Every structure is written in C-alpha cells, then in structure tokens.
C-alpha cells in the first residue's frame, strides 16, 4: 500500500526588482497578517533604509517596532523573542543581511508567527530557505525553521551592498553543483531519500549561475537580479526536499570545519565555493568540471584558493580531512579521506 506523503512549505509571495522595498507593506497586506510588525535589523541596514521601511508600514496603518541585533547567536534569538512579546508583535520582518534574517526567522518560528524576509544583500540562500544558521562557540548550527511567508528583494539596495557579499551569494549557489552530486551519491550508496524535482531545480540553478557568471559584474543591478533569482530557486529546492541536501554537501562540511579551525576568516559563501572546487575533483577526477567551477568563481571575483580565503594550506587540509566528523551526512568524503588524497586534490585544482 502506498503511504508516502510530503508537506512542502514555500513563500506565498516573492517580490524582486528595482525599488520593491516600497511594496513591502503592500505584500504584507496581501498575506492578511494581524498585529504589529517587529522589524529585526542590524546596525548597517538600520542606517541605510529602515526609516523608509518603517514609514511605509505607518502609512499602511501599522505600528512597527524595531529591534537591532549586533551579533548572530542563540542569545540574540532569545532577545528578539522577548522584544516581540513585550511589543506584542504579530509578525516579524527580517531586514538586512544573513544575520537579522536568520535571527528573525528562528524567533518567528519559536513564536509561531509570520515572518517576512527583506534582504539588503545577496550573500547566501538563507533569505528564502527554511533553515537558520547561528554560530555557537567554534560551531555553526543549522536550525530548521519555517521559510518566510514573503520575500521582498530590492535589487537597487542589493546592488549597492558590498560586492564581496554578492560574490559570496554567487559562490554559495555555484556550490550546489557538487551538493547535488553528494545527495545522489548518498541515495545510491546509503539509500538516502532523493527528490528528483528538488535535485534538478538546484542543479539547474547552479548551472544557470555558472553559464551567466561572465554577466555578473560589480555595480550592475542586473547582476543582483540574476543572483537573487538563483538564491530564491535554491531556497525553494530545499523547501521541496524538506532538507538542506539540495544546497549542502561535502563543501558545506568543509566550510563548517573551517569555521571551527579559522573562525570569522572568510565569508561562508566564499568558503563553500573554494571547497566545491576540491569536492568536484573528488567526484569526477582530472577530467571533471572542477575547472568550470573554478573559472566561474574567478569570473565573479570570488576566491578560488585557500590563500585568497585568508586560510593557510595546513588548516584547509585539516578541515578537508576532518569535515566528515561535522554531522552524519554521507558525501564524497565518506568516512574521511587521507591527508595525501586531500593534498593531491587541493594541489591539482590549484586551491593550494
């Protein structure tokens, strides 16, 4: 008897384009959310445009409150929850980069209230996914949460954000290329459930960014448009899968281990991008697509070597050989790879 079922949670509205920040209140009204909005932001976006966001909520008849978070931590999540309760917030709006969006997402999930994602940078696919990422000590935790009810991504704001944040978002998407290969491998060898739809969507998204990498240039709003659409597609793939598998494989394990070994040295997206060069080589060997991955990263000014990440070769090899210990997720790293194999892969691909 067939008993399989699934529950896919997706954003109800995705608004992307020039000046769409001014349509945030309109998007919220279409969701019929009740109560007071709590805008969760960090110091930089607060200086940039939070007044603009607050004023349109006021014009629409809302009484918004604002919470500014200084760091990403579980304590920050708890403080936002306390603020939301004190301000009797009906829904939360994450406004800024990955930090306020992840914190607002997790706080809204804990309070079982609505969450709206309003990114001002395209640094990773957390702007639309059902995962929150929070560091604790030398470990970064990925926590399940409901995805946003709406995503409002103003390409004008995003195009004016620091270029390295955009290149990190691009690299995060390009790394989906090897994440899907790891997922397929785990399906074949460990009988891990695999979604053809989610896998194909994630793979297509990575391919689209690789194919268009030459068009992604600093200061071009069209580049922000391409990257945001890719980040949305990646987040949707994870929601369909009910897992981060479509966008997180061995390259993410290596990145998480780098967070432990060399904390706050490089951006997450840049780390997974460099790691994906190595993991593609491990998957496919000398004749594989690692050069294509590397060249796509280079064309958008993203790092392609450990040195460009600011990480010495010894630490990168240590992260690669111990990354399998991070979590119980089968990848091309298996139960760990030998030091000599890691050095050979990193040296052949030019990562070292």
From Swiss-Prot:
GO biological process assignments: glycerophospholipid metabolic process; phospholipid biosynthetic process
Gene3D superfamilies: 3.40.50.1970, Dehydroquinate synthase-like - alpha domain
Enzyme class: oxidoreductase
Tagged with keyword Endoplasmic reticulum: no
Organism encoding this protein: Natronomonas pharaonis (strain ATCC 35678 / DSM 2160 / CIP 103997 / JCM 8858 / NBRC 14720 / NCIMB 2260 / Gabara) (Halobacterium pharaonis)
This protein's name: Glycerol-1-phosphate dehydrogenase [NAD(P)+]
Co-factor(s): Zn(2+)
Keyword Transferase: no
Annotated Zn(2+) binding sites: 172, 252, 268
Annotated EC: 1.1.1.261
Function: Catalyzes the NAD(P)H-dependent reduction of dihydroxyacetonephosphate (DHAP or glycerone phosphate) to glycerol 1-phosphate (G1P). The G1P thus generated is used as the glycerophosphate backbone of phospholipids in the cellular membranes of Archaea.
């Amino acid at each position: 008897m067939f008993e399989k079922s699934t529950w896919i949670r997706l954003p109800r509205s995705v608004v992307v384009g020039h000046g769409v920040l001014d349509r945030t209140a309109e998007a919220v009204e279409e969701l019929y959310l009740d109560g007071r909005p709590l805008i969760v932001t960090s110091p930089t976006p607060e200086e940039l445009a939070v007044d603009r966001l607050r004023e349109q909520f006021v014009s629409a008849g809302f009484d918004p409150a604002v919470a500014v978070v200084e760091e990403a931590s579980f304590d920050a999540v708890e403080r936002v929850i306390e603020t939301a309760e004190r301000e009797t917030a009906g829904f939360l709006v994450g406004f800024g980069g990955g930090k306020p969006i992840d914190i607002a997402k997790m706080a809204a999930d804990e309070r079982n209230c609505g969450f709206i994602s309003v990114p001002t940078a395209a640094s990773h696919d957390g702007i639309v996914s059902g995962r929150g990422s929070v560091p604790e000590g030398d470990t970064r935790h990925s926590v399940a949460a409901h995805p946003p009810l709406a995503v409002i991504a103003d390409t004008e704001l995003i195009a004016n954000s620091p270029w390295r944040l955009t290149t990190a978002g691009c690299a995060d998407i390009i790394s989906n290329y090897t994440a899907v290969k790891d997922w397929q491998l785990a399906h074949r060898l460990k009988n891990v459930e695999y979604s053809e739809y989610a896998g194909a969507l994630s793979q297509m998204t990575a391919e689209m960014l690789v194919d268009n990498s030459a068009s992604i240039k600093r200061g071009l709003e069209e580049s922000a448009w391409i990257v945001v659409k890719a980040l949305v597609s990646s987040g949707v793939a994870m929601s369909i899968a009910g897992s981060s598998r479509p966008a997180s494989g061995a390259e993410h394990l290596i990145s998480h281990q780098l967070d432990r070994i060399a904390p706050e040295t490089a951006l997450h997206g840049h780390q997974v991008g460099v790691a994906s060069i190595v993991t593609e080589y491990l998957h496919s060997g000398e004749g594989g697509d690692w050069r294509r991955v590397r060249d796509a990263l280079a064309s958008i000014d993203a790092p392609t070597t450990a040195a460009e990440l600011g990480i010495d070769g010894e630490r990168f090899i240590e992260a690669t050989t111990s990354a399998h210990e991070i979590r119980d997720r089968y990848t091309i790293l298996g139960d760990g790879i030998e030091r000599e194999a890691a050095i050979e892969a990193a040296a052949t691909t030019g990562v070292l």
